């Protein structure tokens, strides 16, 4: 066996499916602004930058279905479909743009 490298991660062979079994909502999103907009993996998508045009009611309580710590960047004039998944756990949204600041299911 080869010596371990500090901080090295040893993983099992195969693929890891993120958010397996979670319901997915696909929305079309367009950046109508003149600057790029970046949205992180755990940002409450309904509260994303106002320059992004999409169905905000359908995005309520959801986040991007991408790996944790990553983001999607929308260049000016860019349009694309994104997959969203519901927040799990306590489903309480605090902060972001201050539009909810409490439980999603109240």
UniProtKB/Swiss-Prot annotation:
Keyword Cell cycle tagged: no
Cleavable signal peptide: none
Protein name (database record): Urease subunit beta
A GO molecular-function annotation: urease activity
Gene from which this protein is expressed: ureB
SUPFAM superfamilies (UniProt xref): Urease, beta-subunit
Localization: Cytoplasm
Keywords: Cytoplasm, Hydrolase
Complex formation: Heterotrimer of UreA (gamma), UreB (beta) and UreC (alpha) subunits. Three heterotrimers associate to form the active enzyme.
UniProt catalytic activity: urea + 2 H2O + H(+) = hydrogencarbonate + 2 NH4(+)
Pathway in which the depicted protein is active: Nitrogen metabolism; urea degradation; CO(2) and NH(3) from urea (urease route): step 1/1
Keyword field contains DNA-binding: no
A Pfam family matched in the record: Urease_beta
Coiled coil: none
Gene Ontology CC annotations of this record: urease complex
EC numbers, comma separated: 3.5.1.5
Enzyme class: hydrolase
Annotated InterPro entries: Urease_beta-like, Urease_betasu_sf, Urease_subunit
Similarity section: Belongs to the urease beta subunit family.
